[in-house]
């Protein structure tokens, strides 16, 4: 019969192994600049030979230039991830600037691979996230300039500028070199090919004609 100490050791090893699998591994060298032309397929990118690495691999110019806000939802997300800065490969971090028109919003979405921490630079934002089933609890807050809010990894969240006259600006840091974004309405009603209207009518408990109308809309992407 196994001793209590052996059982405890086995449990601790199992816990440590699970935690190691559940998160990105730590870098094993100073940096691993993404080699986007490498034929090697890995989870992320293969490393560029260090002798070819320059400071430009860790640099992106003029991120804070004001981008467009002309889409229907009234916001623009400018993401700086490993695709823009190859030096972010294996470092587990990226950053985004979000510009909101008056009454603009960053609609409900998730980041499947990252936690987000948002800081308001200008204006006011109403923000929130919803927990998983079965409770679906909404945690929301009105943020002003300098305020910070956290959106846990994978949970549906949003930001809305309630001011009808003034724009707002925020910066978000995300805990992945490639956090991904799934905008809920776009994914459900704008998938290609479309989800069966019978499936969605049943799921949302509405008439099929309502689903057909929603699927006929142009679901604009505000992430660039």
UniProtKB/Swiss-Prot annotation:
Glycosylation sites: 76, 135
Residue span(s) of domain Cupin type-1: 62-212
Signal peptide: 1-22
UniProt keyword annotation of Metal-binding present: yes
GO cellular component, one term: apoplast
Stored Pfam families: Cupin_1 (PF00190)
Gene3D superfamilies per the UniProt record, alphabetical: Jelly Rolls
Family to which this protein belongs: Belongs to the germin family.
Subunit-level organization: Oligomer (believed to be a pentamer but probably hexamer).
Role summary: Plays a role in broad-spectrum disease resistance. Probably has no oxalate oxidase activity even if the active site is conserved.
Protein name: Germin-like protein 8-8
Species this chain originates from: Oryza sativa subsp. japonica (Rice)
